Amino acid sequence: YRTTPSRDNIPKDDDWNETLVKETADLIGDILSEIKDLGLLSVSFLEALPIRTEDFPDDSMFYPIVESVRNTLIKEELLPADDGSFVSAGNAKLARGADLRKLLGQVQLGQLFQSTATIKWLAGEITQDRTPDLRSYLISELDVEEVTPDGLARRISHSFLSVQPDEWFVDFYGYLSGQEAL
């Protein structure tokens, strides 16, 4: 990038800088899959991406990069899932607590959300306490739903319960016993 003489800033109205921003946006959209293939795409890597949207308003010089990252994460299976695989934002759910991830496996998530697509829990290390910026980004920018105990209670239906095995009900009642608010 071309900088100011003191090298403390990057002029926004410079044609070369505008071209470089566009090229960087294209590159980051393309390279994320390769980073995944190399085994380097992790929760900590996602935290290094431009996910603090308040730092990049719509008129920011670097907004095209932010937009490219967002669009790529929405479309492609690049978010670390709890089972060690990856999932796109549209097929991802955040669990409020490890017990919820343990209670509902992939098949049950699909049944609960009445989806024919494979829905997966995001990696358990993505939490309000450990990764607040990433969690907020996933929810507000990528529209990933956070499933809470209350949300589970509202979503459970007769059709969902009728297809669950007896062993699951033992786990379910054990889970409910730890949820005083329900």
Language model segments and positions:
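GHKL/Bergerat-fold ATPase module
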Residues: 1-182
